[in-house]
């Protein structure tokens, strides 16, 4: 448990889009994104395998697929430009790669908000060892 706390603290203070993504999740859902989604289901957090467990986990699966299509920058570390306008997330900036990363995060944050009713605490801190079904293709 101590190791998980250290990871969480490091992520909260992370520069780049991991902290930006957490901010988007917080603004769209009203909950603290990093802690609520970091090890949720089979796809939220680093890595992923098996079939998504619910619609919330599917948001993470789609987000992973989106990151996989980004070329030219590190999706987890680059800092992108975004703003909130009338409750909407608006991605900006001149770098097409970072804008693509922002769009991945924006779509995932909206997906989390639209699927909050599927969020199940039993999938928090879920072990990838329990994700045994064949993985889906993006």
UniProtKB/Swiss-Prot annotation:
GO terms for biological process: arachidonate secretion; lipid catabolic process; phospholipid metabolic process. It comes from the Eukaryota. It catalyses: a 1,2-diacyl-sn-glycero-3-phosphocholine + H2O = a 1-acyl-sn-glycero-3-phosphocholine + a fatty acid + H(+). It is found in: Secreted. Binds 1 Ca(2+) ion. Its EC number is 3.1.1.4. Residues 1-16 form the signal peptide. The keyword Nuclease does not apply. GO terms for molecular function: calcium ion binding; calcium-dependent phospholipase A2 activity; phospholipid binding; toxin activity. One of its GO terms (cellular component) is extracellular region. It is an enzyme of class 3 (hydrolase). Belongs to the phospholipase A2 family. Group II subfamily. D49 sub-subfamily. This is Acidic phospholipase A2 PL1.
């Amino acid at each position: 448990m101590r190791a998980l706390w250290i990871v969480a603290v490091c992520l909260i203070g992370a520069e780049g889009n991991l902290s930006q993504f957490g901010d988007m999740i917080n603004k769209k859902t009203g909950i603290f994104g990093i802690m609520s989604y970091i090890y949720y289901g089979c796809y939220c957090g680093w890595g992923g395998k098996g079939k998504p467990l619910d619609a919330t986990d599917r948001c993470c699966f789609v987000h992973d697929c989106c990151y996989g299509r980004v070329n030219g920058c590190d999706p987890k570390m680059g800092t992108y430009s975004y703003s909130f306008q009338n409750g909407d997330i608006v991605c900006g900036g001149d770098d097409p790669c970072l804008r693509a990363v922002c769009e991945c995060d924006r779509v995932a944050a909206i997906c989390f908000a639209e699927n909050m009713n599927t969020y199940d605490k039993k999938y928090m801190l879920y072990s990838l060892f329990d994700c045994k079904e064949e993985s889906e293709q993006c």
